[in-house]
Amino acid sequence: MITDTVEINRRPEEVFAYLDELDRHGEWQSQIESVKVETEGPTRVGSRAVDRRQVPGGPRDIPYEVTQHDPPRKVSFRGVEGPVRPVGTVTVEPLDDGSRSRVSLEFDLQGHGIGKLFAPFARRQAARQIPQDQVKLKERLESGA
């Protein structure tokens, strides 16, 4: 399990609203080349999207669904296809009477079939990338996104 936390000088409601826009995840997650949201309407339990990510071996589509949605505090997701599938939870906590936020990520990559061989490598790569992406998220939100 990979965990990472970042503090952001924005209200939790604003942070969660930005995270809730699945099609904007490529603005702060550097491996994402594109996002296709497959479910119409606001994000909710059961919402699905496909991230096209640059991974070793070339671009790969990573389909996932939202499994928990508790605005403005928590969202969980899980991959639904592929040999290596993401699973995670993002929690947004208020700081300083709600004027700032702490964003905590719990994340893992689960191997299925042949993916059990690749998951440890992918997990190590994600452990290096996630802190950088969290910094980009902070910078993006604090600059007015």
Residue ranges and their predicted role:
Residues 1-44, 145:
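Hydrophobic ligand-binding cavity/cleft-lining segments
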Residues 4-6, 37, 62-68, 79, ...:
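Hydrophobic/aromatic beta-strand elements that line small-molecule binding cavities or substrate pockets
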Residues 8, 55-57, 70, 81-83, ...:
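A generic beta-sheet turn/junction motif
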Residues 12, 40-43, 68-72, 91-102:
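A short, structured loop/turn motif at beta-sheet edges
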Residues 47-54, 75-81:
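Short beta-strand segments that buttress and anchor functional surface loops
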Residues 54-60, 111-114:
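Short, cysteine-centered beta-strand-loop-beta hairpins and adjacent loop/turn segments enriched
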Residues 78-132, 139:
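Beta-strand/loop substructures that line and gate deep hydrophobic ligand-binding cavities in soluble
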